[in-house]
Amino acid sequence: MIPVFLAAVAAFLPLTSGHIAFWHNSMYGFNVTEQTFPYDNRPVVPLQYMTFQEWWFHNHLDYPPHPGDFFDFPAGKAATAELACNKGATTWFNSSEGGNIQNGNDPCPGSPPSEYHTTGIDDVKGCAMAIAYESDVRKIKPEDFTVFSVNQTCVWYRFTDFQVPERMPPCPPGGCHCAWFWIHSPDSGGEQIYMNGFQCNITGSTSHVPLAKPKVARRCGADPDHGKPDAVPGNCTYGAKQPLYWLQKEGNNEFDDYIAPPFYNDLYNFKDGAQNDIFVDSYPDGIPDPSPEQTIVPTPVNAAAVAAATPAPSSSGSSPSSSSPGSSSTASTTSTSGPRPSARGFRRSTGERPPTGVPTPRKSWTQTRKLRYVCLDRARIVLCCKGLALMVHRLALQRGRHQEPSAQGASLAFLAAG
């Protein structure tokens, strides 16, 4: 009885232990088993020291999903993926070799965390979702993928959320292609990379701003394990970034040492959650070339927030301080150009107190200056003339110039007439 039991356990162990994959029927190689290739090329098998064909899309391009199977990423929301050591630990267990072994949120039922390469939740290094806006998978190149979502608590849970940027544009006809990427901690197991490609779609898209061309990520975060306790923000890659292609025979874009792997976390400026600065208009002032000596840290512009905060122009032809229909009083206040006129200035020009919270259009400096010297009625005209005559008389006396008796008398007579 014991030998039979041990044989059953031995047959079961390869299916429940070791490594992790993204599981969904939209993925390439969804039904690949240990016997499909001359070598073990199941989706959970890690990738290291391989040729480009062997590691790119896990060499599963000849095992595509059904044309209509897509994984949906809702713009501005979270998409929940299933990460597990075996398909039987997911909701797709009915097509697995070992049947249903689900155990709640456990990514690797019956196995310790070392099977998914971590010593604990404090030792996880993050994973990423990347997208290529191309429906023909054969046309996609490594530099076409852009990381758009990162979960730094990965791998730890079977159900893993990936926040999607709100401004993700829609996919082309035929959909997009995405890929899940992971590089684990060096504290538990040998180093590798993980990649599972799949058909995907962006749902609920309201923006058509394209993604920027992704660049290679750079090591810039605090790295105390390798003698660098402080981050170097100037050395970071900002904006759209490529996935980390590392430790292969060819096709690498990262060349870190085996004992210092790259990660999808702050070490390479992959912030947790949606990567909201990956669009062509995210950095209107440009991005400086990264280097350890660079001191300028660019700040992305949240174009969506700016657009929402900008009031729509009024169609009534009113002044710039007028708000559009439906705008709040706050929006009207903030859209007024220049400072508000003081209460004193308001009363002087209208004779009334200014309504609370309502700005008064301020005259330009030139216009105000002109009005100071315009007399609006006959009495003021007389007063102005008297003032001018008195000014002329005083200037004449100061300069020692003598007017003709008739002119001087006329001036004095005009002053006396008042």
Curated annotation (Swiss-Prot):
GO MF entry, a single one: monooxygenase activity
A Pfam family of this chain: LPMO_AA14
Biased composition (Low complexity): 307-343
Disulfide bonds: C85-C108, C127-C154, C171-C176, C178-C200, C220-C236
Cofactor(s) the protein needs: Cu(2+)
Top EC group: oxidoreductase
Signal peptide: 1-18
InterPro entries: LPMO_AA14
Segments traversing the membrane: none
UniProt-annotated glycosylation sites, renumbered to this chain: N31, N94, N151, N201, N235
Region annotated Disordered, chain positions: 307-364
Places the protein is found: Secreted
Cofactor note: Binds 1 copper ion per subunit.
UniProt GO cellular component terms: extracellular region
Its EC number(s): 1.14.99.-
Biotechnological relevance of this protein: The unique enzyme activity of AA14 family LPMOs involved in the degradation of woody biomass in nature offers an innovative solution for improving enzyme cocktails for biorefinery applications.
Keywords for this protein: Copper, Disulfide bond, Glycoprotein, Metal-binding, Monooxygenase, Oxidoreductase, Secreted, Signal
Family assignment from sequence similarity: Belongs to the polysaccharide monooxygenase AA14 family.
Described function: Lytic polysaccharide monooxygenase (LPMO) that oxidatively cleaves xylan with both C1 and C4 regioselectivity and that specifically targets the protective shield made by heteroxylans that cover cellulose microfibrils in wood. Catalysis by LPMOs requires the reduction of the active-site copper from Cu(II) to Cu(I) by a reducing agent and H(2)O(2) or O(2) as a cosubstrate. Cleavage occurs only when xylans are bound to cellulose and not when they are in solution.
Record-given protein name: AA14 family lytic polysaccharide monooxygenase B
Species the sequence originates in: Trametes coccinea (strain BRFM310)
Phylogenetic placement of the source organism: Eukaryota, Fungi, Dikarya, Basidiomycota, Agaricomycotina
GN (gene name): AA14B
